[in-house]
Structures are given as structure tokens and as C-alpha cells.
């Protein structure tokens, strides 16, 4: 049988570091970034697969060392800047590398208050919430950059409804005008290259605070809408969230949400003569709903 290699990529996964940034005016005033990096290369590596010829391979250990050295010697805030630095480095250094994929997952460490003000160098790790960026960059100059919030777990004990849905002979779900709504937020926004510029302009956008500002806006919109909207459905609420982000962030091309609907079932205590007025629930580990959507701006109609 005749075969051919149709695609390949390789690199280093789970490269972890924590970097401390000290204020030049007050070294005790510090910021920290804990991150996990994946960096994958593609290009002229076919013979390493098809002919067992390793001469073209940049060892994955070299990829790991490069990530750590650049984390030490360059500015890494925000993570979109560092992703662009890594991607351009590998394309510039190795002529046979035609494309680079970089994913950076940043843990959420937040300063906590002591005597009413944030402490200079003490932090709380806020659960499993992550800030993420993904960059795919090609030697031709084409790239796709996205940013995300993941595993931001939220719950509200009222202010959510679900009724008026399709019913058939398989339907057992009862309509409700008052229920618990809980989810693990996974929100991703894709940047508009026309607004950002080339991959080398990502650093300029970072200097202007664009990436941090949109991250903060997306997080605030998500939390505020979740809290204040009397949600008719997860579908309607996530569409409203995405629309608001697009209205605020002119440099964003699209916004996607993936929201699991984590179920809490009312516990029946009638056997004990007790009415359960939406007070005691069972947190169901599985199964759960999963709702996804992507929202983009409407193209302007040409006259």
C-alpha cells in the first residue's frame, strides 16, 4: 500500500513557569504571572517522519528552553504579546519552519487586601479560572489570534426561567419561571487582523492596553449580564453577552461562548411533610446541557 504524509506538527506541551515583575521604584511591589505554554512547529520536517531523518528536527527540549529564556528576557504581559514573540522567534530563527502555534494559559492570581488596601506582593489564586490566548502564525504573515476566559464558575439562585420549549413524547422536563442557573464560562473572542495589523503590531496593541481592556470588558459583561438579566434561556443570555462585547470592542471580529448548563434538582421532601420552596437542591454531576454560539457583526449592506 502506498501512503503519504498529509500533515504534521510537533513541539513542547505543558511548559510551566511563574514570573515575578518588580516595580523599579519599589522592588517590594510586585506582579506575578503563572502560565502554561504549548508551542508547536510545522514546516520542512517531512523526512523525519517518512525517512527517519532527524536532521531537520528542532528538539522539543530546545523549544522548551526557548520558551523559558524568552520568558526571562522579554516582556510577557499580556500573554498575547508573549505568544507573538514566541511565534515570530521560531519563524525568524529556523528557515524551514513555516508555521507556529502557540497557546498560553494564565492562572488568575489576584492581590488581596490587608488593612483595606491590596498587599504589594501577596496573592489569592482564584479557583480554576484561566485567561488564554491562541496564536497561529505562518511565514507568509497570515495569523489568527484569539483570547479567552475559561472555567469561570458562576451560579445564581434565582433570576432564570425556561419555558415555551418544544415538547414531544420524549419530553419529561417541566417548565419553570424560577430556577438555579450555573455554568463554567468558556468565552473566546477572535481578533480582527485588519484592526490589529501584522503579527508584529500585536506588541503595539499590547502597549495601548487593548488586550487587557477587552479581557476586562468581556469578563465584566459576562458577570454583569449573568447577574442582572432575568434569563429566559442560556441561549438568549449568551447571545446578549457576545453582542455587548462586540459593541464595546471594535478590534474583535467574533465572540464565541460554550456554556454547560449545570443542573441543580429540587429535592422532594414531601414524604416528610415538608414543602421545598426552591431552598434545597441536589447538585447533579451529570449529565449537563451544553450550549454554544458564535456571534459576529453584520456586514454593512452596500448601496
UniProtKB/Swiss-Prot annotation:
<feature type="binding site">
    <location>
        <position position="162"/>
    </location>
    <ligand>
        <name>urate</name>
    </ligand>
</feature>
<dbReference type="GO" id="GO:0004846">
    <property type="term" value="F:urate oxidase activity"/>
</dbReference>
<feature type="active site" description="Charge relay system">
    <location>
        <position position="60"/>
    </location>
</feature>
<feature type="binding site">
    <location>
        <position position="235"/>
    </location>
    <ligand>
        <name>urate</name>
    </ligand>
</feature>
<keyword id="KW-0560">Oxidoreductase</keyword>
<feature type="active site" description="Charge relay system">
    <location>
        <position position="12"/>
    </location>
</feature>
<feature type="binding site">
    <location>
        <position position="60"/>
    </location>
    <ligand>
        <name>urate</name>
    </ligand>
</feature>
<dbReference type="Pfam" id="PF01014">
    <property type="entry name" value="Uricase"/>
</dbReference>
<feature type="short sequence motif" description="Microbody targeting signal">
    <location>
        <begin position="301"/>
        <end position="303"/>
    </location>
</feature>
<feature type="binding site">
    <location>
        <position position="61"/>
    </location>
    <ligand>
        <name>urate</name>
    </ligand>
</feature>
<keyword id="KW-0576">Peroxisome</keyword>
<feature type="active site" description="Charge relay system">
    <location>
        <position position="263"/>
    </location>
</feature>
<dbReference type="GO" id="GO:0006145">
    <property type="term" value="P:purine nucleobase catabolic process"/>
</dbReference>
<dbReference type="InterPro" id="IPR019842">
    <property type="entry name" value="Uricase_CS"/>
</dbReference>
<dbReference type="GO" id="GO:0019628">
    <property type="term" value="P:urate catabolic process"/>
</dbReference>
<comment type="function">
    <text>Catalyzes the oxidation of uric acid to 5-hydroxyisourate, which is further processed to form (S)-allantoin.</text>
</comment>
<protein>
    <recommendedName>
        <fullName>Uricase</fullName>
        <ecNumber>1.7.3.3</ecNumber>
    </recommendedName>
</protein>
<comment type="similarity">
    <text>Belongs to the uricase family.</text>
</comment>
<feature type="binding site">
    <location>
        <position position="179"/>
    </location>
    <ligand>
        <name>urate</name>
    </ligand>
</feature>
<keyword id="KW-0659">Purine metabolism</keyword>
<feature type="binding site">
    <location>
        <position position="234"/>
    </location>
    <ligand>
        <name>urate</name>
    </ligand>
</feature>
<feature type="binding site">
    <location>
        <position position="261"/>
    </location>
    <ligand>
        <name>urate</name>
    </ligand>
</feature>
<comment type="pathway">
    <text>Purine metabolism; urate degradation; (S)-allantoin from urate: step 1/3.</text>
</comment>
<dbReference type="InterPro" id="IPR002042">
    <property type="entry name" value="Uricase"/>
</dbReference>
<dbReference type="GO" id="GO:0005777">
    <property type="term" value="C:peroxisome"/>
</dbReference>
Amino acid at each position: 500500500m502506498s501512503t503519504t504524509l498529509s500533515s504534521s506538527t510537533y513541539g513542547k506541551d505543558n511548559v510551566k513557569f511563574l514570573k515575578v515583575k518588580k516595580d523599579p521604584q519599589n522592588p517590594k511591589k510586585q506582579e506575578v504571572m503563572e502560565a502554561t505554554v504549548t508551542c508547536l512547529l510545522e514546516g520542512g520536517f517531512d523526512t523525519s517522519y517518512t525517512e527517519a531523518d532527524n536532521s531537520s528536527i528542532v528538539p522539543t527540549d530546545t523549544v522548551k528552553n526557548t520558551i523559558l529564556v524568552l520568558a526571562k528576557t522579554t516582556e510577557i504581559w499580556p500573554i498575547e504579546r508573549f505568544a507573538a514573540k514566541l511565534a515570530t522567534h521560531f519563524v525568524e530563527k529556523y528557515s524551514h519552519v513555516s508555521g507556529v502555534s502557540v497557546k498560553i494559559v494564565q492562572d488568575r492570581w489576584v492581590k488581596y487586601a490587608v488593612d483595606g488596601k491590596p498587599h504589594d506582593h501577596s496573592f489569592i489564586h482564584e479557583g480554576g479560572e484561566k485567561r488564554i490566548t491562541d496564536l497561529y502564525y505562518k511565514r507568509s504573515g497570515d495569523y489568527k489570534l484569539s483570547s479567552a476566559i475559561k472555567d469561570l464558575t458562576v451560579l445564581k439562585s434565582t433570576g432564570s426561567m425556561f419555558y415555551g420549549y418544544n415538547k414531544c413524547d420524549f419530553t419529561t422536563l417541566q417548565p419553570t419561571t424560577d430556577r438555579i442557573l450555573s455554568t463554567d464560562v468558556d468565552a473566546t473572542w477572535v481578533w480582527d487582523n485588519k484592526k490589529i495589523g501584522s503579527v508584529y503590531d500585536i506588541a503595539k496593541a499590547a502597549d495601548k492596553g487593548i488586550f487587557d481592556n477587552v479581557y476586562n470588558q468581556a469578563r465584566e459583561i459576562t458577570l454583569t449580564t449573568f447577574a442582572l438579566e432575568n434569563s429566559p434561556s442560556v441561549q438568549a443570555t449568551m447571545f446578549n453577552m457576545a453582542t455587548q462585547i462586540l459593541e464595546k470592542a471594535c478590534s474583535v471580529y467574533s465572540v464565541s461562548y460554550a456554556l454547560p448548563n449545570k443542573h441543580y434538582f429540587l429535592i422532594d421532601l414531601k414524604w416528610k411533610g415538608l414543602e421545598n420552596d426552591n431552598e434545597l437542591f441536589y447538585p447533579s454531576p451529570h449529565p449537563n446541557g451544553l450550549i454554544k454560539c458564535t456571534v459576529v457583526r453584520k456586514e454593512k449592506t452596500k448601496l
